[in-house]
């Protein structure tokens, strides 16, 4: 009898277990109603695990991580040594970066001067720094690691010259809108002369020192007897993993609020914004007027509702780096433009590959971010991935490029950029500014 009772007990327990498992299976396959209609608990759990956008996936950024393309010329008593196809992140820039960082950190009052004074300084011992994009002086200081530089109204600095003088080195700079300026610095002239004297020439010169077709160019155009070898790029759409992109952009990757239009673009509308993902990797966003702290769309500011220019650039950089940096291949991002009016900032970034800037044929940017108050309300992206190939890029010789520029432009400043037309390969060309 005891054996029968024990057997019955085991059978009852087994039956209860089977019924429990069956109930759970039925539950997870049962669609819910209301706002969760069409989703089973199991599917919701999957969505939560794979698509939780509450986790902070944004990268931590610093302005020193922006790879600003530059051209540098060291001039001593005997020769010039030039560098091109480098950025502020490259080791080849360290010497110039150290001197200009110290100069900007110790510069006193900037006084207006003539352009001839800056040009004259280039004839003697000096370091010349040419920026690919007009850059606010305050931002340039941060890029060079100077954290305590004073605020400045110079917003479009294009070139700088540092030269020895009697009482410390003198810094000249040009602002594209406001003209030329000069300032004393705390840099030892003896230290600067010693660094310059240690360098040998490499056949670099300025157009102002040359004759013939070069004399009609901008005097600041750099002529390299042996220009750096550049290579063609393989280019592709980097928006291949939409789920990951949506999660980084704080959208639900499993949302049912999206649709595909006749052009093949995916449009996703959520409460806080709308994303448009185009087949070629272009992305457009329009969002709410206010973002929550911690969101990728929130711009931190010391003064509520009034981010400074540096804070706006930092917020835009955080978004651009989060969405683009890990998928852009060999390309790096640099700040290429910033505009402001009232409480609105528009910050743009572009790609550089191997130290050479890349330009889109339609004049657009790799990323453009609009900030109002403390919220990113719009952005546009080119999600493109670039890989340096082993094939040398074909480039017209500088003399021929100069002859063509002379016939079309007045005092053109020539430099080399990658020319992006949306194809799967990208070459280089001469651009006149």
Feature locations, PLM:
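Alpha-helical transmembrane spans
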Residues: 13-16
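Exposed beta-strand-loop-beta-strand "reactive/processing" segments of non-cytosolic proteins
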Residues: 242-288, 327-375, 381-382, 412-433
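Short, Lys/Arg-rich N-terminal segment immediately upstream of the first membrane anchor
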Residues: 1-11
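Long, charged/polar, surface-exposed segments that mediate recognition or autoinhibition
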Residues: 287-339, 371-409
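Zymogen propeptides/activation segments of proteases
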Residues: 148, 152-182, 193-196, 202, ...
